[in-house]
Each structure stands twice: as structure tokens, then as C-alpha cells.
Curated annotation (Swiss-Prot):
This is Probable 4-amino-4-deoxy-L-arabinose-phosphoundecaprenol flippase subunit ArnE. GO terms for molecular function: carbohydrate derivative transmembrane transporter activity. Gene3D superfamilies: 1.10.3730.20. It comes from Shewanella sediminis (strain HAW-EB3). The lineage of its organism: Bacteria, Pseudomonadati, Pseudomonadota, Gammaproteobacteria, Alteromonadales. It is found in: Cell inner membrane. Keywords: Cell inner membrane, Cell membrane, Lipid A biosynthesis, Lipid biosynthesis, Lipid metabolism, Lipopolysaccharide biosynthesis, Membrane, Transmembrane, Transmembrane helix, Transport.
Amino acid sequence: MTTFLLFVLSVFSSSMSQYWQKRAAMLFAMQPDLRPLQKLFSRPLILSVFFLGVGAMTWLGVLSVWDVSMAYPLLSINFVIMLLLSHYVFNEPISVRQWIGITLIMLGVIFLAGGEQWLI
């Protein structure tokens, strides 16, 4: 598997972990009487931990090849993914300030990654 595919899988897994953490928080808010073990073994929390683990393992694969000084800033793509996901899945509004912010983030990612041979 190429390093770029590992990076994509890491970003996807990290975003999915955040998604399932939000789902877990929503479940716990809707059912405040859940006992700690019920929370610990709830489907959303288990999926969150699973995706967190996949993200960590694939990230280690990325770091074994790419310089952390270049790879880590590219993880800011997660901010963009989560903003859009929260809007379309959780119906959270996106302000003009947020649109400007994600545009700047994406410009930064393009600037950092543009034309560099380490992406291949």
C-alpha cells in the first residue's frame, strides 16, 4: 500500500473516530441513566475506539516514510471533513467565518503538498 493511501486511510479513520465520538456523546445525553459499563461498551464508543486505533496504526505507517514536519500539517484536512460532516449529518450550521477558515486550511494543504515528490 502506498504511503499516500495510508495517509488517506488515516485521515478517514480519524474523522470516523470523531463522528462516532459525537454519536456516543449524543447517546449519553439522550440516555443519562446509562451505567458506566453500558457507556463503555456502547456501539458508538466501540466504533470510535476502533477507528482511532486504525487511524493510529496507519499514521505510524505514514510517519515511517514522510517527514512529520510535512505530514502533520496535512492532517488539518480532518477539520474540513468534520465541519462538512457535522453540517450534513448533524445539521450544524456553517458560518461565513468557518467557510473562510476551511478555505484557508485547504489552501495551506495545497501549498504544502503541491508538487512534492513525497506524496507519491
